Amino acid sequence: MSDVAAFTAYPVIAIDGPTASGKGTVAHQIADLLGFHYLDSGSLYRLVAFVSIRENIDDHDVNSLVRIASELDVRFKADHIWLKGEDVSLALRHESVGNQASAIAVHGPVREALRARQRAFLEAPGLVADGRDMGTVIFPEAVLKVFLTASVQARAERRYKQLIAKGFSATVESLSRDLEARDLRDRTRSVAPLRPAEAARLLDSSDMSVDEVVAQVLDWYRQVQGVKAR
């Protein structure tokens, strides 16, 4: 099936937003509730970052990074990510990997190398995709585009709780600085900068629970599908 036909046949919900905005948790829950496939696009960049760190490759060595992106032997199963048969799920959550991924994501050739892999996730009955450019670049014809954000303080506190729960050491202050730096890099990069897609629904989750955000996105999706059905 062609990309155009797939877009017509299978609905896509694209959820974009900055680091630690909660988009991954929300997207995963919505995919489960709808029975859709789920794409965590950030994990692909983290995988490239993880391999580059392991192979001691500089984040400016674009040719080597493209090679890594093109050769990723990855498998997603439940909440686990397997790289060449190795469960790297926990390792990918480390802040050093996230910072490297953000630096790598500025390179157009790397993004292009991962483009086809991301689009391949679009299968029946539908897809929920989260990332930085799902609604603007990868799935521009998504039936629902959401830009999910939150204050730096709220995001730093969420990230802190996640890292501590996984056994990593961190402070809210250092995480806030990292988030501000990554936000700036994501917004100002020349290729696919972080921004709301045209017609995206904007949602600030600073003072919302995960359940409240999920309910809002599902309500928007039902509205969109209702409009399509008429």
UniProtKB/Swiss-Prot annotation:
Ordered alphabetically, the record's keywords are: ATP-binding, Cytoplasm, Kinase, Nucleotide-binding, Transferase
Quote the subcellular location field of this record.
Answer: Cytoplasm
One family from Pfam that matches here is: Cytidylate_kin
According to its UniProt entry, the protein's GO biological process terms are: nucleobase-containing small molecule interconversion; pyrimidine nucleotide metabolic process
| Disulfide bridge positions per record | none
Primary localization class, coarse:
cytoplasm
The EC number(s) attached to this protein equal 2.7.4.25
Residue sites binding ATP per the record = G17, P18, T19, A20, S21, G22, K23, G24, T25
According to its UniProt record, which reaction does this protein catalyse?
CMP + ATP = CDP + ADP; dCMP + ATP = dCDP + ADP
CDD domains of this UniProt entry?
Answer: CMPK
- The protein's name in its UniProt record: Cytidylate kinase
Query: Where do the coiled-coil regions begin and end?
Result: none
Main EC class of this protein? Answer: transferase
Q: From what organism does this protein derive?
A: Ralstonia nicotianae (strain ATCC BAA-1114 / GMI1000)
Source species taxonomy:
Bacteria, Pseudomonadati, Pseudomonadota, Betaproteobacteria, Burkholderiales
